[in-house]
């Protein structure tokens, strides 16, 4: 502390959030986790006796995988996402996988390639199976995906990415894997598209 005050420093927003988390843990005996918080803070916040320096190792601290974002994250709303993004920052994450709303990218791209609304939505799988579609090894399972879901998750995805950027994170976005819907062969019969086995 300095002059009886708690002072947290960092060279970026994620470092500051990490410093805050360290202060809560090691000076206030508090805890923030996925499964619950213990934030019974003392009436007067303790001032550390000595300065503590911590270095965050690793330039890129990646978080999430496709399965986490399908099994659990697919059902999160904005409130839950805000908590998760804060949790990431408090735990030094600066490079999260960020694919909320990717179904909207696919939907709109397929429309531009001449798919109907029904065809584009039928290509997309249900939210619990997004991991397999994004990896990519599945299509048209559990659909068609409702347009209301697509629209709401385009908006949610923008909120998630904007918040991650505000905190100085670099979201990992899905690139094009080369996989296309099998229906592309009907729509573009001259194209050289290799069909994978069922």
What are these regions (language model features)?
Residues 1-9, 13, 18, 27-28, ...:
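Aromatic-lined carbohydrate-binding surfaces of glycoside hydrolases
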Residues 31-33:
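Conserved short beta-strand edge segments in small beta-sheet-based binding/regulatory domains
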